[in-house]
Design a protein with these regions (language model features):
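ABC-family P-loop ATPase nucleotide-binding domains
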Residues: 1-79
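Walker B motif beta-strand of ABC-family P-loop ATPases
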Residues: 81-87
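Walker B catalytic motif
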Residues: 87-88, 95
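Conserved D-loop-proximal element of ABC-family nucleotide-binding domains
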Residues: 93-98, 143
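Helical "lid/switch" subdomain of P-loop NTPase nucleotide-binding domains
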Residues: 96, 120-123, 127-128
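Conserved H-loop
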Residues: 111-119
């Protein structure tokens, strides 16, 4: 929910190191800094961040919205096959929610999975899930489509506790 701050490590260094680690794991050559910076500028546009963010320490002094955008930027750069976004809508104003949601939607692919944890239906106004699962005491007690989220918003959780 609350991305950690990493004082002394710039976003650029963090992302470049992580990206090259992925390339190395895949048996590819590392990407030179100049090429990576060009690649990264395109990814910044996805989340509405300015290039100046790259020189700032990771999440240090970032607003809640900036931290969430930075998480989506990391997803855009690293292209994970599985991403877990825990309450990514927490603390976001409506503009930041829209930008973060657009980023998540653009990163959806047939070869990846995004697990999105939220307590509020408003995120689902922007991101249409394939499935909605309700957890209670560590177990999935109900599964459905986005209409399940609307029902939860309307009725709460009490009707599920049998």
């Amino acid at each position: 929910q609350y991305p950690i701050e990493v004082p002394g490590v710039s976003n650029f260094t963090f992302l470049h190191t992580a990206f090259n680690s992925v390339l190395q794991h895949q048996g590819s050559e590392p990407m030179p800094e100049g090429d990576f910076r060009e690649f990264l500028v395109q990814k910044l546009k996805l989340v509405g961040m300015k290039p100046e963010y790259l020189d700032r320490p990771v999440n240090t002094g970032f607003s809640g919205g900036e931290k969430k955008k930075n998480e989506i930027l990391q997803m855009a750069v690293l292209s994970p096959r599985l991403a877990l976004l825990d309450e990514t809508d927490s603390g976001l104003d409506i503009d930041a929610l829209r930008i973060v949601s657009e980023g998540v939607n653009k990163l959806r692919r047939a070869d990846n999975a995004i697990v999105l944890v939220t307590h509020y239906q408003r995120l689902l106004d922007y991101i249409k899930p394939d499935f909605v699962h309700v957890l209670l005491n560590g177990k999935i007690i109900e599964t459905g489509d986005s209409s399940l989220a609307l029902k939860l918003e309307e009725k709460g959780y009490d009707w599920l506790e049998k």
